[in-house]
Amino acid sequence: MRGVHGGGTPELLLVASDSSVIYAKAFFDLQLQFAYKVAVLSGLPLARALLDYTNLYIRFGLGRDFDPAHPTWREYLGGLQDADDTREWTYRFYLRRPDAMAAPGIVATFGCFSYSRSSGDRIRLHFENADTDGHSSLGMDRLGQRLADLAALFEHVKRTLPQPLQVVGASWLYNLDAYRRLFPIPYLATAHVIRRFRHMPLWGQFLDRYGEIKENMTRSFLERLECQSSLDSVGECFPFQVLSVQASVQEFYDFYGANQREQPGGLTT
């Protein structure tokens, strides 16, 4: 599996969560190109490839039901069929959808981290590169601050949601040591690859903090995609796979409480 547990801190890590940033046209061009390749390899209609193998449905603000009969989705597909330039049509359709710019249902935000209620007894973690001084939010010099963000977040969870909870996450960022060091080991130990082509935890790796495309990463991805002859292997074209993780909230209470009692930044000497 490409890129798992990679060291170092990539430049301009972007959001693992959806945010209100306006994404660049190149981000949509990339997904269209991927969908066209999927359609060729699989024999699927392009409409189905766009629904199942891109983030467009969510980016258009249509939720996560992925209903092929949704009126807005059908409007998009109708325009796509008639468009002289499918890339231009797709981006203009995105820009005129006000719901597409809306942030998810975040409960609370602490620095670069936030959380949302998932289902029942679950909360979901989100990360956004919120530092604005040009430094990486996941750099070693920010380790103490990121741990403080998470300690504050889980203090809020403990105070406002006293029932037993499961903490869940899904992101390409869990491949990176710079991100993994922020979380308890039992949580990381559950990491497993999930193949979900519809969601930002996969596609977000191609974006910087400003919503612009990472050109070098994108170029390498497209070169690998061009060489594929089977649908089974298209997921391997992505630089990083999405890892899903889950653990009891008590693991987080224990981990961040212990870090606060140790040296600054949660590191023992």
Language-model segments: what does each one mean?
Residues 137-156:
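Well-ordered, non-membrane alpha-helical segments in soluble/globular domains
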Residues 172-174:
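An acidic- and aromatic-residue-enriched active-site/binding cleft used to recognize and process polar
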Residues 1-138, 156-168, 177-269:
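Non-catalytic substrate-recognition and accessory regions of acyl/acetyltransferase enzymes
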